From Swiss-Prot:
It catalyses: UDP-N-acetyl-alpha-D-muramoyl-L-alanyl-gamma-D-glutamyl-meso-2,6-diaminopimeloyl-D-alanyl-D-alanine + di-trans,octa-cis-undecaprenyl phosphate = di-trans,octa-cis-undecaprenyl diphospho-N-acetyl-alpha-D-muramoyl-L-alanyl-D-glutamyl-meso-2,6-diaminopimeloyl-D-alanyl-D-alanine + UMP. The keyword Aminoacyl-tRNA synthetase does not apply. This is Phospho-N-acetylmuramoyl-pentapeptide-transferase. The gene is mraY. The keyword Transcription does not apply. Keywords: Cell cycle, Cell division, Cell inner membrane, Cell membrane, Cell shape, Cell wall biogenesis/degradation, Magnesium, Membrane, Metal-binding, Peptidoglycan synthesis, Transferase, Transmembrane, Transmembrane helix. It is a multi-pass membrane protein. It holds the Pfam family MraY_sig1. It comes from Magnetococcus marinus (strain ATCC BAA-1437 / JCM 17883 / MC-1). Its EC number is 2.7.8.13. The chain crosses the membrane at residues 26-46, 73-93, 95-115, 136-156, 170-190, 201-221, 238-258, 265-285, 290-310, 339-359.
Length: 362
């Protein structure tokens, strides 16, 4: 909004030239989302505590200590992230950019599903919430609508292709398979972040690092000279996604203030599903889906641990891990919760750097 209001007057006041720069608006989006999180966080936590007498229902099949230590902690704190991201993005992004509206649609669509799921858990005291098939169907419909818009409205010639990291000219035309591929990327990422959100601050840290990395990728992909130099797909308009990613970074950092161990609030499905969908959408729109699997490797590992655990038990009747997702395995091995969280963050930072390195290694 500020771009449309202020930049047209840069001839009268040269300082308004700043608003043409994506880097400046990205930094301001980070600070705006961070400020909103800090200001609204305490009020929202008090409000959630008053509405949720017993806090988030704790899974009975999880680690026993969670029943004691985490009981009574309010959930649905992800609404704070959504508000901060929305306001910061609307203030600092170009509102004529279709990528902004499509990423917001994915984020808030998945956020709405997560909100419903959280509400079901609280109202009916059922940790399972909305049936999995219902969630998957709704998520799929949202992603298909976004994929159709990208393919037939935004840029038919650009979307529908899969670019491989490291290999400069290796691009595959997915054709009709672009649509199920989009579902795998966005729905998969949304649920992977949700699976990871099992310890205080565990999911929000890697989500923040992934968003920061994709802010750089988006800026490069939307700048012809940068994209040409790096040998990555040039996506006209994608640089505005850096502002959206910046808003996620600021909102995540602000939320972490309240979610760090011991957490005052949990993000809930409303936050985890929304963040995952946001990251998956940005990866799809910048054609860096495979790089997302590297940068968001913590989410991939957590998801694979669940798949391996279930498959192993069904096939041979034995479990590979003491408990899945993987962070629970380390809990049962006696690792302190803060140690697990920080080590997963360290791994996430390393993977983000590796993912960014693939931009240059061609």
């Amino acid at each position: 909004m500020f771009y449309h209001l202020l930049y047209p007057h840069h001839d009268l006041w040269s300082v308004l030239n700043l608003f043409q720069y994506v880097t400046f608006r990205t930094i301001m989006a980070i600070l705006t989302a961070l400020l909103i999180s800090f200001v609204l966080g305490p009020w929202l936590i008090r409000k959630l505590q008053s509405l949720q007498s017993s806090g988030q229902p704790i899974r009975k099949d999880g680690p026993e200590r969670h029943i004691i230590e985490k009981a009574g902690t309010p959930t649905m704190g992800g609404t704070l992230i959504l508000v901060a991201v929305l306001v910061a993005t609307l203030l600092w992004a170009k509102l004529t950019n279709p990528f902004i509206w499509l990423t917001l649609a994915a984020t808030f669509g998945f956020g709405a599903i997560g909100f419903w799921d959280d509400a079901e858990k609280l109202i009916h005291k059922n940790p399972k919430g909305v049936p999995g098939r219902t969630r998957f169907l709704l998520q799929t419909l949202i992603v298909l609508a976004i994929a159709l818009a990208l393919k037939f409205y935004v840029n038919p010639e650009v979307f529908g292709k899969l670019a491989f990291p490291v290999f400069k000219d290796l691009v595959i035309d997915l054709g009709i398979w672009f649509f199920p591929f989009a579902v795998i990327v966005i729905v998969g990422c949304g649920n992977a972040v949700n699976l990871t959100d099992g310890l205080d601050g565990l999911a929000i840290g890697p989500a923040m690092f992934t968003a920061a990395a994709f802010a750089l990728i988006s800026h490069a992909a939307g700048h012809y000279n940068f994209a040409n130099y790096l040998g990555i797909p040039f996506i006209p308009g994608a640089s505005e996604l850096a502002i959206f990613c910046g808003a996620i970074v600021g909102a995540a950092l602000g939320f972490l203030w309240f979610n760090t161990y011991p957490a005052q609030v949990f993000m809930g499905d409303v936050g985890a599903l929304a963040l995952g969908a946001a990251l998956g959408s940005v990866a799809l729109m910048t054609q860096h889906e495979l790089v997302l699997a590297i940068i968001g490797g913590v989410f991939v590992i957590e998801t694979l641990s669940v798949i391996i655990q279930v498959a192993s038990f069904k096939l041979i009747g034995k479990r590979v891990f003491r408990m899945a997702p993987l962070h629970h395995h380390f809990e049962l091995k006696g690792w302190a919760e803060p140690k697990i969280i920080v080590r997963f963050w360290i791994i996430s930072i390393i993977l983000a750097l590796v993912g960014l390195a693939t931009l240059k290694v061609r």
